[in-house]
């Protein structure tokens, strides 16, 4: 048992699965994920325009 034979025998990266192998459920799931991501990006854009929601909370006085 030499030191060179140890370790993983299989490759680290798995071969990519082609799009033809995906069934209808996987295609629908990916489409739904894309739509959700678009909605999330739109909401982030709208939220960035309005500014921060903070402003209340505990106010500290300058006295010690």
Curated annotation (Swiss-Prot):
It comes from the Eukaryota. Residues 1-64 are annotated as: Disordered. The keyword Coiled coil applies. Keywords: Coiled coil. Residues 53-64 have a biased composition (Gly residues). The keyword DNA-binding does not apply. Residues 21-50 form a coiled coil. InterPro entries: TMA7. Pfam families: TMA7. Residues 27-45 have a biased composition (Basic and acidic residues). Belongs to the TMA7 family. This is Translation machinery-associated protein 7. It comes from Xenopus tropicalis (Western clawed frog).
């Amino acid at each position: 048992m030499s030191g060179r034979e140890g370790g993983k025998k299989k490759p680290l990266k798995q071969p990519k699965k082609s799009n033809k192998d995906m069934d209808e459920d996987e295609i629908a799931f990916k489409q739904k994920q894309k739509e959700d991501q678009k909605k999330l990006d739109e909401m982030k854009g709208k939220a960035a325009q309005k500014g921060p929601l903070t402003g209340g909370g505990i106010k500290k006085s300058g006295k010690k």
